[in-house]
Amino acid sequence: DMTVIDVGQGTSVLLRTARHTLLYDTGPQYSRESDAGGRVLLPLLRSLGEERLDLLMLSHRDSDHVGGAGAVLRGLPVTRLASSLETSHGLLALAGTLGVDREPCVAGRRWTWDGVRFELLHPTAEALAAAELGKTRPNTLSCVLRIGGRWGGQAHTALLTGDLEREQEARLVAQHGGSLASEVLLVPHHGSKTSSSAAFLDAVAPRVAVVQAGYRNRFGHPAMEVLARY
């Protein structure tokens, strides 16, 4: 079960298998007193009867992706946190105090829950090491997660991309080619002009493309020229 959550200008996707739950990003912080974690995600998870998260994945450090993470960590037991955050980031420290296992998103990591396959395609260990030296922009480190499984007698796939940009898209195409093909694509970077290159879209060839962006947002997401490529 995959739920793309309306958090306004930000990203959050809930993935549930028969016995496991993964939350990919936590949306924005709306103000000092309010964020998507407390206002949207915790009420949603509780309404669905979810009492814990097996994995919280934070694609990168931008506030529209991690703004609700503190509230989620404090409000619900979390087993593991995977992210591209630098090791000094406050959310990793918070997770540590709460007894959450912390690990980096690293390309090549795979696991299976209840017959559903998960694989991280990005970032590389080298990119994460460069980020620790302040040599990498957060968007370029976005955790890219591929999900695949069978239900209804058919194979289904989805690709979650964070704020991935064209250069990283090109590397994925060069490395994976047509195996990137996915039925559902979370449109990179909210439909920004920085992303959704033609070669990447040809490789992924999504049947459904989902843009997470706030109504009349100040960034102009999604860009009309990007939508035209879909």
Give residue ranges: language-model regions:
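Non-globular, low-confidence helical/coil segments that flank catalytic cores
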Residues: 1-230
